[in-house]
């Protein structure tokens, strides 16, 4: 049984890498060469296939280990990639905006490459859970946090892309210099189909995506506090991960506050979202490389 699962695991890893590479190439060929737009369908299909293979990887490990596969760095990286791909697939389906896949495929390929090629084999293997992780809160807290990271990352990437394009426009470079400049955004299932230009599209979609990810982040932090009280007798201990999770929450709370109450649009909230992109990665990966705190187990040791 183990050998069969191990073969499925390796095969799925290879297929995931290959499909993400095809997805990346397809999307960017479509953006650079406007006459071959049909290549976007190859990119989208490859993204779906990559998401399926990661599902197989995580499902196989779940069956093998007997617990939800979120106990070490490799598993969390793969789950984060799954969240990124699933979110991109859904958003692209709803909006027909292929730029989403074009910006998500590179970061997904990088994460998968790092997790499968850079991490030592010992860190990729499922290991027995430490006592503190033997709880139903493992799935509730960690999975929700990872899903919030994936949606917040996509929302932030869209905001960063918005800033790149607006700066190019301000420097008197027409957006027509970009291969994707003439894309229009349509709400396919809206009663009144509305077309927006590219910059308005990115600003609006970034706001909506972050608006979805922020409640997930809030729920994940609350679930983690409840779990911490059960495991260590305290809801909050100012662990490095907890501190940076709070900083992440505050950054995106400021973003949504500015959008909702101050009616900010355009560049100003985009800068906040770009800051959030950096903060999310510090919270997720940077803190763990310190090897300190309650969240260091199962990651680098």
UniProtKB/Swiss-Prot annotation:
Keywords for the protein's UniProt record, in alphabetical order: Chloroplast, Cytochrome c-type biogenesis, Membrane, Plastid, Thylakoid, Transmembrane, Transmembrane helix
UniProt-listed Pfam families: Cytochrom_C_asm
Keyword Plastid listed: yes
Record keyword Membrane present: yes
Membrane topology term: Multi-pass membrane protein
Subcellular location: Plastid, Chloroplast thylakoid membrane
One Gene Ontology cellular component: chloroplast thylakoid membrane
Family assignment from sequence similarity: Belongs to the CcmF/CycK/Ccl1/NrfE/CcsA family.
Oligomer status and interactors: May interact with Ccs1.
Protein name: Cytochrome c biogenesis protein CcsA
Protein source organism: Guillardia theta (Cryptophyte)
Gene (UniProt): ccsA
């Amino acid at each position: 049984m183990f050998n069969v699962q191990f073969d499925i695991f390796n095969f799925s890893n290879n297929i995931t890498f290959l499909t993400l590479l095809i997805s990346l190439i397809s999307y960017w060929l479509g953006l650079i060469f406007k006459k071959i737009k049909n290549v976007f369908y190859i990119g989208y299909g490859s993204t779906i296939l990559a998401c399926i293979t990661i599902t197989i990887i995580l499902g196989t490990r779940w069956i093998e280990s007997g617990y939800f596969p979120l106990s070490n760095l490799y598993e969390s990286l793969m789950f984060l990639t799954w969240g990124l791909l699933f979110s991109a697939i859904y958003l692209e389906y709803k909006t027909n905006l292929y730029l989403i896949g074009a910006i998500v495929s590179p970061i997904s390929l990088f994460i998968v490459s790092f997790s499968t090629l850079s991490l030592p084999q010992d860190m990729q293997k499922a290991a027995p859970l430490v006592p503190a992780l033997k709880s139903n809160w493992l799935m509730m807290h960690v999975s929700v946090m990872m899903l919030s990271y994936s949606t917040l990352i996509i929302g932030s990437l869209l905001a960063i892309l918005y800033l790149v394009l607006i700066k190019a426009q301000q420097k008197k470079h027409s957006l027509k210099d970009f291969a994707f400049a003439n894309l229009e955004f349509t709400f396919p299932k809206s009663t009144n189909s509305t077309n927006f230009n590219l910059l308005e599209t990115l600003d609006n979609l970034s706001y909506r995506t972050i608006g979805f990810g922020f409640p997930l982040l809030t729920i994940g932090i609350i679930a983690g506090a409840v779990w911490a009280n059960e495991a260590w007798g305290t809801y909050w201990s100012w662990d490095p991960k907890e501190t940076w999770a709070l900083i992440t929450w505050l950054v995106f709370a400021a973003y949504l506050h500015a959008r909702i109450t101050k009616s900010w649009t355009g560049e100003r909230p985009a800068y906040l979202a770009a800051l959030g992109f950096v903060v999310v990665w510090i919270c997720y990966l940077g803190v763990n490389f310190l090897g300190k705190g309650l969240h260091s187990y199962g990651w680098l040791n």
